[in-house]
Regions:
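Cytosolic juxtamembrane amphipathic/interface segments immediately preceding
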Residues: 110-120
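Soluble N-terminal domains of membrane-associated systems
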Residues: 1-103
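Core alpha-helical transmembrane segments of integral membrane proteins
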Residues: 119-139
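Cytosol-/stroma-facing membrane-proximal "stalk/adaptor" domains immediately downstream
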Residues: 98, 107-110
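Short coil/turn segments at secondary-structure boundaries
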Residues: 36, 109, 127-129
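Juxtamembrane loop-helix boundary motifs flanking transmembrane segments in multi-pass membrane proteins
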Residues: 105-108, 133
Length: 139
């Protein structure tokens, strides 16, 4: 993968990465405070100050508005699946925090987020164990 300087990214590319972070957290059962916090950390990592970012969350949609001083840019992202995977939530939170505080390369941060996204869609427990747990819980 080529080295990409995050300062040369368009505002649209930056907003997509911020929304990717929020979507990953929302689809894996994170709370709204954590989603907003980690999205703002990702924005700060990309050079966007928190004062210039407005984030609004609903059950299935993330809305972000960024003011770059000249114009405002708005993007929406739909979240179609909702589940619980606290490992993915923890990994995504750590990834955004490490990217910000350790000044991680952009490519490594994006690759890490995509890896977390791929691993979060895999089944954690075997199907027989889920069925057994449901049976025990409902008896």
């Amino acid at each position: 993968m080529e080295n990409i300087d995050r300062n040369n990214l368009t505002i649209r590319d930056k907003m997509k990465l911020i929304l990717d972070t929020g979507q990953l957290l929302m689809e894996n059962g994170s709370g709204s405070k954590r989603i907003v916090r980690d999205m703002l950390e990702t924005a700060a990592y990309l050079g966007i100050y928190w004062q210039d970012v407005q984030i609004h969350l609903t059950y299935s949609t993330i809305m972000i508005n960024v003011d770059d001083g000249k114009t405002t840019h708005t993007m929406f992202r739909k979240c179609y699946r909702h589940g619980i995977n606290m490992t993915a939530v923890l990994q995504a939170s750590r990834a955004s925090r490490n990217a910000l505080y350790q000044n991680a390369p952009y490519d490594r941060f994006v690759t890490h987020l995509h890896h977390i996204q791929e691993s979060s869609t895999r089944r954690i427990y075997p199907e027989w164990m889920v069925i057994l747990a449901i049976g025990l819980a409902s008896s």
